[in-house]
Amino acid sequence: MFALFFDYATTTNDLDATTLKSFAIIIPCVALIVMYVLFGWFWSIAIGLQTKVPNTVKMKVKKFKVFFFIPFIYILSLLVFMALFGLSDFEAEPDLNSAFPFGLLTIMLPLHFLSIFGIFYSLYFVAKTYKTVELQREVSFSDFAGEFFMIWFYFIGVWIIQPKINEMVEDTPMEAQYV
């Protein structure tokens, strides 16, 4: 997404304010679509498979929901801020002596790290839920480390994990579907 903007910006000599403003709308909108799909997939696995978790295993669903919505709200507000900032007529040479950049950094940096932690906890919880349902027992990180990385690199992992999730939900073995 950003590569498209960079490619356009470097190959075009007539990059005007209207083009920049249109990219200020397009890039956050595309990022929102990707975010909704990815976070929706996380939510559907983590919450949707809770009915298949054995009664002997206690999953911390409330903790997941808190850490799920922290990055969700942070990314959403960041994209809205970027779109509004991109639409405004900001100065070409901002005053770096003002308190705004420092104040923004002191607010954004801790929120960014909290958001990163929330995303990793969501990945952890989704992978743990998936493996708990698959094995029908309490699992440790070593049991679901592979699933954790497949969910993290979702563009590859979705092709491996999603068919198994579909099988878990349907309660029919995958081999039986092709006989």
Sequence positions of predicted segments:
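Membrane-helix interface segments in multi-pass membrane proteins
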Residues: 2-35, 75-117
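Membrane-interface helix-boundary motifs at transmembrane edges
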Residues: 13-20, 51-63, 134-138
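Low-complexity, intrinsically disordered extramembrane tails and loops of integral membrane proteins
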Residues: 13-18, 167-179
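Hydrophobic, aromatic-rich membrane-embedded alpha-helical segments
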Residues: 35-36, 143-164
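Membrane-water interface of transmembrane alpha-helices
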Residues: 36-51, 122-128, 161-162
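Alpha-helical transmembrane segments with an aromatic anchor "belt"
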Residues: 45-75
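Cytoplasmic membrane-interface regions of multi-pass membrane proteins
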Residues: 45-57, 127-136, 167-173
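Feature detects long, helix-prone N-terminal segments enriched in hydrophobes
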Residues: 75-79, 104-148, 161
